[in-house]
Amino acid sequence: MDILKHHTIKRLYVIAFLVVMIACGSESNPESAINNLEPRAGVSSTQIDSIFQTLRYFPNQTQFSIAFIADSSVTFYGAIRTNDTLRTINNKSKAFEIGSLSKVFTATLLADLAVEDKLQLEQPIQAYLDLPLRDSLQITFKQLANHTSGLPRIPSGFIWESLLHMNNPYKDYDEDKLRNYMSHELELADESETAWQYSNIGAGILGYTLTKVDGRSYEEMLQQRIFDPLNMQHSTTQREWVEDRLVTGLNKRGNPTSYWDLGAIPGAGAIVSTAEDLAKFALANFDPNNEALRLQQQKTFTVNSDWDMALGWFIRKQNSDHVYWHSGGTGGLRTMLVLHPESKKGVVVLSNISSGHKHAGRISSLGFSLL
């Protein structure tokens, strides 16, 4: 082998090694994490230990913003990992992208319009659209809200398009593309009336259709129907409004990453919010006089023996116990909201670590364990 060829191959090996190292990133070591989390009134030592046992699996700069709701009181607890040390911080007013947890709020808008008799849950959405659905498909509001429409998780061809913006996959999914999909590409992944299939595009179409029903933008509907009445001052789909509060998202390697733009389907996951604001929403869900939230909590579909669907909510069943929940995940953040209406208890968990991190599922588990 000549010297030039040898050095060329050596360089290629070095480049390949560096690419692999960059892709893998540094692995956070749970055993190296130092626990400096402080006690707090209203949060048990067991709960604090659960927070430590979860956060220690994530890289430096990962933080949790947690709200404990009990009856009419709320206790906040913040934690961050820096220099392999876990410490307590005050981040209850910090804004996080909540991802698919936004679907709960889209369903709240649906329930609110239903209470006002502006639509019927069993009504096909076609009546409110100014374009035909492909093959004259009949899809109802309820089916979109409880994931029984038969629509796929993402629109056809989206995977290839998203490769152009891997850190912000929905960035270019504008209204023209959505309308073209609905009229010319829409097809059911499952046509069975008893099938359940989680659908991001279904939630996006629901949010889009609701704007046609109400004659207002998705953001305007959120502010006027939910956020303003509940005094959720730092919740929005317009990130620039809360830019000074935004927590930096981390990808699965622990490096800073961008928030997601949802284009024409904000109803699928565009909201940013705070633990403080989400606690207000949780409390509202315990109000027996809130007709829209009462309607939203009604069971609409039985998935299996372990869980049901309400409008936007998952319902976990354990004997006669029913826990309402929804999680959210993007390329840089992971969230969880858990409610137990019977005992008027709830938990909010916001984090700034990617849903693609191999331990991201521990954050959902933490939400249940803290309840």
Model regions and ranges:
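Bacterial Sec-dependent N-terminal signal peptides
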Residues: M1-N35
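Catalytic loop of the DD-peptidase/beta-lactamase superfamily, centered on the K-T-G motif
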Residues: C24-A79, T211-D214, E220-Q224, D228, ...
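Active-site-proximal loop and beta-strand segments within enzyme catalytic domains
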Residues: F58, T82-S199, R216, N251, ...
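Alpha-helical scaffold elements that line and support the substrate/ligand-binding pocket
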Residues: I66, D71-S73, E97-Q120, P124, ...
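Short, solvent-exposed turn/loop segments enriched in Gly/Ser/Thr/Pro and often Arg
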Residues: A70, V74, I125, P132, ...
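Secretory-pathway/luminal and periplasmic proteins that interact with or process carbohydrate-rich
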Residues: T75-Y77, P132-T140, G150-G157, P229-R239, ...
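Glycine- and aromatic-rich loop/turn segments at beta-sheet edges
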Residues: A79-R81, A189-E191, S235-W241
